[in-house]
């Protein structure tokens, strides 16, 4: 670097979810009053980047998302996403040759235990995909499992807010067609997939999975209708147990196995910790289950030794953060709670490593039920400004 060059800090600001479209209709960004943004746009050079489909390692027609965006920006190259990896494995048939899964399923059959499939059930493609559930059910069928239970988490964020009926009807039809499986409970993702340490939400989902919910019905379609009657859209439908033919709840029991079907990790970690970890203390578990096998579609936590990832993590070498560190430069990652994993873990290529010279600051997100109650979140926090200035 020439000695005459000024050494000034550089800011990379990621406006998550911000996009460009010329049409005014239903375009909140274009219709908003943004004098500062518009001033920057009109004064300085700018360009567009594609943030979906094959441009970020996703299948054709698949929208991008926060994790994918941060991963590709941090990598500086196209990174094949887990959705595409899993789809390819199913298409090639390799998915159905997974020895650890097959051996676990054989053990369940020999011991008369049950398989429980958990996860977000939709075709949103951000955290999971319903096609992966169907592939896992096919494998369970091939292994001649008799006791297979599905605990779908309802979407309504990456899909329309009242679209759960079509997905659950489709699931029920598929279960009847293949001749195995029963829906044992449902839960809105607001409860089962919290990532902001709102543990009372996770506790409700945990109790439904392990003991049964005080809210119970005999038909999952009825459970959704009742949720709508309570003015709950899909993501907010309270954990509900679906009774069996003997009017009993179906729960995860000692010796049963679990496969968590989410391939995105951030919203799967908390409920996994509650189900699996011996030293868990975020809330008092009224019932601790000894799960025989706990599979996750991808790795949720590299330090977790009690679960097994079906698809191992792929490494992204020489990411932006790693490169900056190798140059001996300093870097600061700052975000509030909701996006902290994205500017750290995902931006570093799915790597938990904190590089030399890398500082991290987490600004707490506001404690509100939903962020439409405080849409600015913590953007006006003095901590953002003071920490940036101090670095």
Residue ranges and their predicted role:
Residues 383-390:
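Conserved small/polar residues in nucleotide/adenosyl-binding loops
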Residues 22-23, 82-83, 194, 250, ...:
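Short helix/loop capping segments that flank catalytic or ligand/cofactor-binding pockets
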Residues 109, 159-253, 266-288:
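Long, well-ordered, tryptophan-enriched scaffold segments
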Residues 2-10, 19-190, 200, 204, ...:
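Active-site nucleophile/metal-coordination loop of metallo-enzymes that catalyze phosphate/sulfate
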Residues 9-15, 258-262:
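Short, hydrophobic/glycine-enriched beta-strand segments
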Residues 16, 77-86, 356-369:
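Short, basic/glycine-rich phosphate-binding loops at helix/coil junctions
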Residues 330-382:
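Conserved ATP-utilizing enzyme core subdomain
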Residues 250-270, 276, 287-291, 299-302, ...:
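Active-site pocket-lining segments that scaffold enzyme catalytic pockets across diverse folds
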């Amino acid at each position: 670097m020439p000695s005459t060059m000024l050494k000034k800090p550089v800011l990379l600001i990621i406006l998550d979810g911000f996009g460009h479209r010329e049409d005014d209709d239903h375009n909140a960004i274009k219709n908003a009053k943004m004098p500062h943004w518009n001033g920057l746009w009109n004064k300085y050079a700018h360009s567009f980047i594609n943030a979906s489909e094959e441009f970020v390692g996703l299948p054709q027609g698949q929208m991008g998302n926060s994790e994918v965006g941060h991963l590709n920006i941090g990598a500086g190259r196209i990174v094949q996403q887990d959705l595409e990896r899993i789809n390819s494995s199913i298409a090639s048939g390799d998915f159905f040759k997974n020895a650890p899964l097959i051996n676990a399923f054989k053990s369940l059959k020999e011991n008369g235990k049950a398989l429980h499939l958990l996860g977000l059930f939709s075709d949103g493609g951000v955290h999971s995909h319903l096609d992966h559930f169907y592939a896992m059910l096919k494998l369970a069928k091939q292994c001649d499992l008799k006791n297979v239970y599905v605990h779908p988490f309802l979407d309504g964020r990456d899909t329309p807010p009242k679209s759960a009926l079509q997905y659950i009807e489709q699931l029920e039809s598929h279960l009847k067609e293949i001749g195995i499986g029963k829906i044992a409970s449902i839960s809105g993702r607001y409860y089962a997939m919290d990532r902001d340490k709102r543990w009372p939400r996770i506790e409700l989902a945990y109790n439904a999975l392990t003991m049964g919910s005080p809210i119970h019905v005999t038909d999952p379609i009825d459970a959704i209708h009742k949720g709508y009657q309570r003015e709950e859209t899909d993501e907010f439908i309270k954990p509900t147990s679906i009774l069996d033919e003997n009017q009993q709840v179906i729960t995860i029991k000692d010796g049963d196995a679990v496969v968590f079907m989410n391939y995105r990790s951030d919203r799967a970690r908390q409920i996994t910790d509650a189900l699996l970890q011996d030293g868990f203390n975020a809330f008092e578990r009224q019932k601790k289950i000894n799960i025989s096998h706990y599979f996750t579609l991808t790795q949720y936590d590299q330090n977790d030794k009690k679960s097994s990832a079906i698809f191992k993590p792929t490494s992204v070498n020489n990411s932006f953060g790693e490169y900056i560190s190798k140059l001996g430069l300093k870097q600061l990652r700052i975000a509030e709670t909701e996006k902290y994993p994205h500017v750290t873990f995902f931006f570093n290529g799915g790597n938990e490593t904190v590089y030399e010279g890398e500082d991290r600051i987490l600004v707490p997100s506001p404690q509100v039920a939903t962020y439409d109650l405080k849409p600015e979140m913590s953007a006006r926090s003095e901590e953002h400004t003071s920490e940036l200035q101090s670095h």
